[in-house]
A protein has these predicted regions:
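N-terminal low-complexity or simple alpha-helical regulatory segments
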Residues: 1-49
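Short, electropositive, low-hydrophobicity segments enriched in small/polar residues
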Residues: 25, 51, 76-78
Length: 168
């Protein structure tokens, strides 16, 4: 649910690509909004701001351009965004992320997240994550037929899981 918090004409856009339990999206709004809801059942959502013309709050915690936000299965979305806000997001199957974290990264997802919804992974890791999500969206917009191949979907899914663990 989106509720516009500032007066004026609303202009927004949502672009998404979905495959094999993965969603990559880009969302833009020109007005301050309050977003409420929940991610897909059994999923983990991660968002990274691209543009912010003010401050945001995610589940009560302050968010700036150097932060990323995350929401897991069973978590409630409570996100106040400023005017002129744009975000890139990744939603993955939480069980697949837990398995990837344990078997590939040798990390415990719950320990890595530590119940936090806002992270400051550092400029380099944040920039790499932004570039990867933008690149995946751009590549698949140009060549959507690539997703017809299950192997391509698996490679992209593994890349997305690795990228998610790199920023938390």
């Amino acid at each position: 649910v989106y509720e516009q918090m500032t007066p004026g004409r609303f202009v927004g856009a949502l672009y998404e690509i979905c495959f094999a339990g993965v969603q990559v999206f880009r969302e833009a709004t020109n007005q301050a909004v309050h977003e409420a809801g929940a991610p897909w059942p059994g999923s983990r959502a991660i968002g990274v701001p691209l543009r912010m013309d003010g401050n945001a709050r995610f589940r009560g915690a302050p968010v700036d351009a150097d932060a990323l936000v995350t929401l897991g299965a069973g978590d409630e979305l409570d996100f106040y965004t400023p005017r002129g806000f744009e975000i890139l997001g990744l939603v993955v199957d939480e069980h697949a992320l837990e398995t990837h974290a344990r078997q590939v990264e040798h990390r415990d997802l719950d320990e890595a997240l530590a119940g936090k919804g806002v992270f400051k992974p550092g400029a380099t890791r944040l920039s790499e994550f932004r570039r990867l999500l933008a690149s995946v969206m751009q590549s698949l917009e140009v060549n959507p037929a690539a997703l017809q191949h299950r192997q391509t979907q698996r490679v992209l899914e593994q890349s997305m899981l690795g990228a998610a663990m790199a920023v938390v």
